[in-house]
Every structure is written in C-alpha cells, then in structure tokens.
From Swiss-Prot:
Coiled coil: none
Protein name: Large ribosomal subunit protein eL37
A Pfam entry, by short name: Ribosomal_L37e
Purpose: Binds to the 23S rRNA.
InterPro entries xref list: Ribosomal_eL37, Ribosomal_eL37/eL43, Ribosomal_eL37_CS, Ribosomal_zn-bd
GO MF annotation list: rRNA binding; structural constituent of ribosome; zinc ion binding
Zinc finger (C4-type): 20-38
Organism (species): Thermococcus gammatolerans (strain DSM 15229 / JCM 11827 / EJ3)
GO cellular component: cytosolic large ribosomal subunit
Cofactor: Zn(2+)
Recorded superkingdom: Archaea
Cofactor notes: Binds 1 zinc ion per subunit.
Amino acid sequence: MGAGTAPKGKRNRTPTHIRCRRCGRRAFNVKKGYCAACGFGRSRRMRKYSWSHKWKKKRNLSY
C-alpha cells in the first residue's frame, strides 16, 4: 500500500488524542502513549517551558 491519499482516509476511525488523566486536556496521543500538553506518560514532571505562558495563566502563577 502506498503512502498517499488512500491510506490517509483510514485515519478517521480512531481518535489520535484522548483526554489526559493528569491535565484533563484532549492531548494524550493514543499511539505514542504520552500527553502533548503536560508530558504524562513520557515524564513524571509537568511539561513546562519559559516560552509557553498558557500554563502560568491556567494555574494563576506569577513567575
């Protein structure tokens, strides 16, 4: 089977991302087994970067 349009049509059967157990966002990748938002499944620590400020607003932190 090729890698073109026909195989891409099979991607609509199962969801790529489901709700994460840790952060609650719909960012847990089923195939890869980790959350794109908080890093659950890949790391014990929360995924956070200085260039990302949404998590600061969500948690009401001031640093």
